[in-house]
Amino acid sequence: MVLSKRPVRISKACENCRKRKVKCSGGDVCFECQKYNENCVYRQFYRKIKRLKYNNDNSKIDNFSNEQMNIPEFISVRNLNDDSSSIEFFGPASNISFVNQLNHYLRKAERNGYDFLSEGQNDITPEEERKGLEKFGMKLMVLKDNANNFDFSLSNITTEKMNGLLIAYLETWHIPCPIFKAEDLFNLSVRTWKNPSASVHDKALLYLILSIGSAASYFDLQSNSSTLPLARGFFNLALRTVPHIFTELSLDAIRIVFFMSVSAGNLGDTALSYLYSGTAVRMSLAIGLHKCKNFSNDLSDKYQNIRLWVSVWQWEGYWSFCVGRPSCSRQDIPIPAVPNEAFSFSGYGEHGRFLINHEHMRLRVFFSSCCSKIQSEIYSTNRNLLSVLQTVEQISKEVDKEYFSSTNHQLIRSEIGEYCKTLDINSCREWFWIRIYYLYLKLMIFRPFLIFLAYVNISKTSAPDDIIEGLKRGSDQCVQEAIDISKFIVQLNRKVRMLQPIFFICTYLESACTVLLFYIASNSAKIQGQLATEIWAVLRDTCSFLQGSSGPYVGSVSTIAKDALESLNNILVSKKYQDNSVNNTYFDKVMQHVLVHSPAFDDSSDPKFETNRSETPTQYTLDDSANDELMIPDLQGFWEQTLDWINN
């Protein structure tokens, strides 16, 4: 046995200072937390030594490393310590589904000696530890990156193939991020492709655009199964071409870093994508791009710079909201204007392909501005729960009003019928991109209330009727948006064959399906028959639709197959173990951690809480005699704890 020590970075800043990115003064309660009257929480200091068994067979070491890299990690910074019970169940827009996180929890519980099927059996072999959900008849599949095994070389890619990838980009990401006109990209490819004398900036930019185009495919059996490795190859080539791009301050550097962010998001590298998007914004602010300075006397270049800033700003605002991280755009930076002359392009060629639509971009900018507003309102620790509910409902109405008052009526249509087959393909693509943005934004607005209501029901926490009604409205709205977004993506792609960044679009479907999963698991006893039938129909239809997606993507969405859903539902709601003579479900077991860490359940500070102590994680029960005046602050603390779980 050889011990391999790997140091782990220790942050001595408290959570609030870390989020604000300010120096923490330390102490029992740091200066910043005193200033804002907030709870000062430090990470547990620790060092971890990883032990690895190996013999002289180097291939086994490589296989073990690859397998470890394929295990999904949580976004939450509080999950660095395996001994921590602060499990994040549901990250904001993480590609990690509820199924993946439950699997991680089960493996961890087994590692700690809590085998749900065999009480008292603490000797868990490494093979059993990795099984997780396989014990219950579910085989968890993860997305594998085959880029390392892919023979990537520019010499193997013809000019015809390159042009096809360029067109794939124009048919997909050019719509939400229209920085270049189509003719500009074709000119870039002509002067750069396999040209040794071309500038490194042009080469890197072209490689990134080709990477984005490479990840596009169709939701059918004829789609190309090697798209993801090719996209990864171009992305890595771009990084090698401009290794010091982050030290530059120029328009070229901003374009390259921005497309790095989009490409990384396209490949599922959420953390990298978020990092690059913030870097692109900071670069833009540093050179004054947000002030629309005249970097060139050419009018075409001026409009392109405007499109660059608007695209960078709206993408960073949207993406930071999705991954549940703060936006790096300062509050004093105004919302970018969307001038009609900069965002109106009739298209390329006689058929007007790859046009730029002003109204589409105007809506995207408005939605991105709502993202920061939602983030600040929902996750504000200075607002009580009832006012948060009212404010969020008002923001939702503002989003609806702006969207449905659009001058382009095609962008706001919801019905899908035979007319879609004769619809102009440019209009169809724009409609698809803006409507999934709208539906996803609505889903994200209400998802915290869906989860919080489940926590409240599990803990049997008392709450005023108006708060419970508000939570129910938000929960029901979230479920409806999840149903709508799944139906829209599936039905439109069946009517109109469109190139899609499949892995990216699958994250929309996965987010919607995990919401439905969560709702089924937490409401199985009282869900109405008609709604249950509709949810199961949507889930089955989504699974059937995804079976036609290209090879590398199937693994990432197989966990929502019908048999897996039924198995998961049985696991969560079946009586499987006894805890202090009280029957609990797996769902109870998973969810009870939030009660342990909630400030509302501190028995040392309030005698009204009855504690039932045992070796297993402690469960707390509220005294029924507590009056509403005492319960409201407790519920508020419970709400803030839930937000911390969801968003950190």
Curated annotation (Swiss-Prot):
This is Zinc finger protein grt1. InterPro entries: Fungal_SecMet_Regulators, Transcription_factor_dom_fun, Zn2-C6_fun-type_DNA-bd_sf, Zn2Cys6_DnaBD. One of its GO terms (molecular function) is zinc ion binding. Monomer. GO terms for biological process: DNA-templated transcription; regulation of transcription by RNA polymerase II. It comes from Schizosaccharomyces pombe (strain 972 / ATCC 24843) (Fission yeast). May be involved in the facilitation of anaphase progression in mitosis. It holds the Pfam family Zn_clus. It is found in: Nucleus. Signal peptide: none annotated. Residues 13-42 bind DNA. GO terms for cellular component: nucleus. Keywords: DNA-binding, Metal-binding, Nucleus, Transcription, Transcription regulation, Zinc.
